[in-house]
Regions:
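Conserved class I S-adenosyl-L-methionine
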Residues: 71-80
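A short glycine-rich, Lys/Arg-flanked "PGG" loop and its adjoining helix->strand segment in the class I
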Residues: 158-171
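A short acidic, Gly/Pro-enriched loop at the edge of an enzyme's catalytic core
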Residues: 133-142
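A conserved beta-strand element that flanks and buttresses the S-adenosyl-L-methionine
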Residues: 143-147
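Conserved beta-strand signature within the Rossmann-like core of class I S-adenosyl-L-methionine
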Residues: 172-179
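Core SAM-dependent methyltransferase catalytic element
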Residues: 226-249
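Class I SAM-dependent methyltransferase SAM/SAH-binding core
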Residues: 81-131
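Class I SAM-dependent methyltransferase Rossmann-like catalytic core
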Residues: 37-62
Length: 249
């Protein structure tokens, strides 16, 4: 190969790399890399209690699956004490915004809200089937972690809730749900007793609201779980599913 040919090939390679990089930068759906999520989890000001929770939640994989980016606007449904709300606050940074929906605000959430990292968070104390004000829409991401099953025994209109979540998202926005797995035949009947819900039951309810199923993740699956015990006293690690849905463009 001549020097001229080598030079021409090198220029073509540089051009291809440059174009690919430009496309990646321009693509607003490109996720933060997993390495960045690991750095978020390792931040020194996170509490020891949250680090204990990390051991069963696998937050690096969970955040990677969401694809959350700096500057995104996120709603964390069933936020509870704010573990996942804080993770999202760290992901989206000061240019982003996180809303944490709770049916009633827990003392642990109030304490957490005093942390500087939560300055970009607003707590919404609202029923799950009316989770956001009517003027809040165009969100990039909704998360709903280990609390959907609770709505099965709380008198929540889940069809209304799911439609409200759909309306709050921008076209192309994502919904990521994780929950404790029940046997298929148990459906929603063990939400209160075992704190579980059948994966296909949940998926069907979400799709009925207009969401398109995108992907599932396996990093919290435990096939050795018989799924016949309450999750807090399960004899094995709890089998949990993680699902991603999208609002069509």
């Amino acid at each position: 190969m001549t020097f001229a040919a080598v030079g021409h090939l090198a220029l073509r390679t540089v051009a291809v790399v440059a174009i690919s990089l430009a496309i990646l930068i321009a693509n607003d759906t490109a996720p933060v890399c997993a390495q960045d999520y690991a750095a978020i989890i390792a931040q020194a000001d996170r509490s020891e209690a949250d680090r204990v929770t990390d051991k069963r939640r696998d937050p690096v994989n969970l955040l990677t699956f969401t694809g959350a980016k700096t500057g995104w606007r996120v709603l964390d449904m069933g936020a509870g004490a704010g573990y996942s709300t804080e993770l999202m606050a760290r992901c989206v940074g000061p240019t982003g915004k996180v809303y944490g929906q709770v049916d009633e605000e827990a003392e642990k959430m109030r304490i957490r809200m005093a942390m500087p990292v939560m300055n970009n968070v607003t707590v919404l104390v609202r029923r799950s089937d009316d989770p956001v004000p009517s003027d809040l829409h165009g969100l990039d991401l909704l998360t709903f972690y280990f609390a959907y099953h609770d709505t099965t025994y709380m008198g929540i209109d889940r069809a209304k809730m799911n439609k409200a979540m759909f309306a709050a998202l921008k076209p192309g926005g994502f919904l990521v749900i994780a929950d404790h797995s029940a046997r298929p035949e148990d459906g929603t009947t063990v939400g209160k007793t075992y704190h579980r819900i059948a994966e296909q039951t949940l998926r069907s309810e979400i799709e009925a609201a207009g969401f398109k199923f995108v992907a599932d993740a396996q990093f919290l699956r435990h096939p050795e779980d018989a799924r016949t015990s309450i999750v807090f006293r399960n004899p094995t690690p709890v089998d949990e599913f993680v699902l991603k849905f999208q609002k069509p463009m």
